[in-house]
Amino acid sequence: MTKVRQLPEEWVYGEIEWAGLNRMEYVDGCDSNFGILKRDVDIAKRLAETKVKYGYPQTYRTSFAKNSNEAIWTIANILHGAGMLKSVTLAMQSMDQGVLQNIHRKNIKFDHFGELVKKYEAAGIPTYTELIMGLPGETLESYIAGVESNLNAGVSDGLFCYMNLRLPNTEQDKPEYVEKYGLRSVSMQAMLTHGTPNPDVVVERQEIIVETAAMPHADWKRAWLFSKVVEIFHAQGLLQQVAIHCHEANGVSYGEFYQSLMMWLTNWSGTLAGREYRGLRILLDGSLDGGSWDCVDHRLGDISWPPEEFAFARICCDLPRFYDEVEAFYDFWEVPIPRSVRDDQRQAIVGPEPGQERDFATRIVWWGRKGAAAKLRKEGLKT
């Protein structure tokens, strides 16, 4: 049985004091369920008080308890009021009740989930949701439906989709569980996120579940590509307003919209967006064969980016071309999209000035993705 281990409060408060006194701009809390203990509210208050006292830490990030409760709402308001909260997690993993039973997980009830999204949004507190692809019992159809459910609930900017890791000493590592759900995993290189590739550093590897009885490998690959397309073009804003219009005005599901986009990207591989989509497919196949996940473009610095951020940032380096070319998708789509919606979408995202690509990628794409700064792409950065 897993027990929660608590560090002495005086030690925790001492660490917070040290961070403030030594002008630590960013502090990442290692709690896996911050907000699950009563004292966590007091710790949040001490963090806010320390920032008032020293001006530091400027930002505090943590992993909140998986089922959002009133304590997390209180903590979020305390940290947000002090200007040091990046965002609040509304973790779902899957939207399918059968899958949740298979992994012994209880989610926030969906009706309550939608209310929470609106509640935090009204308070100006950024939220994000995490889904995991390839869970036992999840089909391609149920996974896409789960992504749609999040978008329908108003999670437009903060959707993150992750692969399913097979970890030692977990239920997914037990032979009888593996056999029951038809789990197949592949040893893949760990993704280096926002780090500089170094050939002298030992490469870490992870066991990733790439097939289940419910999701054949081909479906798993399509689920991953669908996830990346939604993260690039919806969650990061490139076609978000157009997709929302098609959904609200024409009843088009988000799954239908983005799967049609995937078809268009495949057929129009010579476009800027088509090139990035082709790059995603090549990257995935190479990684499945044991290759690296590294995504480096020296315009964006010398670090490796997550695939969805990499594609988004590169498209933003030539936005006029992207929006000119995507007009062909609007015609291919055959759903009426008014010129006003197209123009508003074109104006919603502002890319970097020549020579400023690295700063843009760092400040807006990396630092801004899980926080309020991400909304600057649609609000503060308008021309």
Feature map (PLM): residue ranges:
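Short, hinge-like loop/turn segments at secondary-structure boundaries
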Residues: 45-46, 146-147, 176-180
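Phosphate/diphosphate-binding loops
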Residues: 60-63, 145-150, 161
